[in-house]
């Protein structure tokens, strides 16, 4: 089968690799000059199935109001005259109930755990090196209230059979000795022993190279304009460099996915949520993190990547803005300096921002659409690196008509249809805009 994958981030590249491995003729189209140059470029670096959680959670609306007045707020909302933003925020609110949170987290952990296993398989079969470490991650709580609130997450972890350790302050220091100077600011932690870390950019570029050696064609510097539709079926994609015909098209364009499928009558509830990172060279290895420490107060992950520390996180709902406010850099620097003071040279930090494609329930959209020939693998939010390998394997199985190894029916776009109604396409493209 001829398959065109739109997007060369970690999700698109892993999809292309799995589809080629299954015997398909695959072409990847991306506007950038190489793979992983947008959201996959400098993310926080953690592969954290156990930490997979929706942003929509009980108590978040009240916290969001308090965060409005915090200097180092983990969430910033910049209201816009944007109907998509309003729909997204209202849908987030609807998912802030205990029942919705438990369902969404369980679904996310299921996919993330499977994805970690698929990544282990990829690492073994390809030999790729990407500054990976298999030493768990530590969710750090600065207050007893945060520690107590972890109870609902622990219930989901137990139900899913995910290994964890609930630690006091001394236990946190045993896991991460570099925290010793911050002991008086630690109430406890939740250590997820099966989690990993690694450089998403290095992995994606390496896998793209292997995929190309295996026959996948990459068309970089090529902008996607519109899907080609004939007889109610997607038959290819029109780009700035011509039309690519296909038996199937996979949309893995992150936050840009909704605009592409909207003319086909599909409302895809994916919205860009801006995240930030700084990358700092290590100058004192004894003070640096061993793996990933997630600062629960500021929603910031501090990760060791070889000889560097990656500090990433926060969330800013501001449309497609790519500005780099100094205040966001200050928050990242404050967090790493507070917990791992002296570990890195902040004067040489590089500052980056990316747009995470978020869904209201935190779960990506993976699978077929009501439009024949059109498939989705998008909406992974902050967990694209964590979920990419598993999402790609699930998608490949579905395209080939195989039953995936995990439950996947609740990963598709159908879950957003109104109760009692199936999502239906409304293909109304102007024939004059289609390729002949």
UniProtKB/Swiss-Prot annotation:
Cellular component, GO annotation: cytoplasm; plasma membrane
Pathway this chain belongs to: Amino-acid degradation; D-alanine degradation; NH(3) and pyruvate from D-alanine: step 1/1
GO terms classed as biological process: D-alanine catabolic process
Keywords tagged on the record: FAD, Flavoprotein, Oxidoreductase
Reactions this protein catalyses: a D-alpha-amino acid + A + H2O = a 2-oxocarboxylate + AH2 + NH4(+)
Cross-referenced PANTHER family: D-AMINO ACID DEHYDROGENASE, SARCOSINE DEHYDROGENASE-RELATED
Protein name, per record: D-amino acid dehydrogenase
């Amino acid at each position: 089968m001829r398959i065109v994958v739109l997007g060369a981030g970690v999700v698109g590249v892993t999809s292309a690799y799995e589809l080629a491995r299954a015997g398909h003729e695959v072409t990847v189209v991306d506007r950038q000059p190489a793979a992983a140059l947008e959201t996959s470029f400098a993310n926080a670096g953690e592969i954290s199935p156990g930490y997979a959680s929706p942003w929509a959670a009980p108590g978040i609306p009240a916290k969001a109001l308090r965060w409005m007045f915090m200097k180092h707020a983990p969430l910033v909302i910049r209201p816009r005259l944007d109907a998509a933003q309003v729909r997204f925020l209202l849908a987030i609110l609807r998912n802030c109930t205990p029942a919705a949170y438990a369902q969404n987290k369980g679904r996310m952990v299921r996919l993330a755990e499977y994805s970690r296993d698929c990544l282990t398989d990829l690492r073994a079969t390809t030999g790729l090196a990407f500054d990976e470490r298999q030493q768990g991650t530590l969710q750090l709580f600065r207050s007893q209230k945060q520690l107590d609130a972890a109870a609902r997450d622990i219930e989901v972890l137990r139900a899913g059979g995910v290994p964890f350790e609930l630690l006091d302050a001394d236990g946190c220091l045993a896991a991460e000795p570099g925290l010793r100077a911050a002991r008086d600011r630690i109430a406890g932690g939740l250590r997820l022993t099966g989690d990993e870390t690694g450089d998403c950019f290095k992995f994606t570029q390496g896998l793209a190279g292997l995929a190309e050696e295996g026959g996948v064609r990459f068309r970089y510097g090529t902008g996607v304009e519109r899907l080609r539709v004939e007889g109610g079926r997607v038959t290819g994609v029109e780009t700035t460099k011509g039309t690519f015909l296909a038996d199937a098209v996979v949309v893995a364009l992150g936050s840009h996915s909704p605009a592409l499928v909207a003319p086909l009558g599909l409302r895809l509830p994916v919205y860009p949520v801006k995240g930030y990172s700084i990358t700092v060279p290590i100058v004192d290895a004894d003070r640096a993190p061993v793996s990933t420490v997630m600062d629960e107060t500021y929603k910031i992950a501090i990760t060791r990547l070889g000889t560097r520390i990656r500090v990433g996180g926060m969330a800013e709902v501001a449309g497609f803005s790519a500005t780099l406010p100094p205040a966001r850099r200050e928050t990242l620097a404050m967090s790493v300096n507070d917990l791992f003071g002296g570990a890195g040279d902040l004067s040489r930090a590089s500052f980056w921002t990316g747009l995470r494609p978020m869904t209201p329930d935190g779960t990506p959209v993976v699978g077929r659409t009501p439009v024949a020939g059109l498939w989705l693998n998008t909406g992974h939010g902050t967990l694209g690196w964590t979920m990419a390998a598993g999402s790609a394997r699930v998608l490949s199985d579905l395209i080939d008509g195989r039953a995936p190894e995990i439950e996947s029916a609740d990963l598709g776009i159908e879950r957003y249809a109104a109760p009692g109604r199936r999502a239906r396409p409304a293909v109304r493209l102007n024939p004059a805009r289609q390729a002949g």
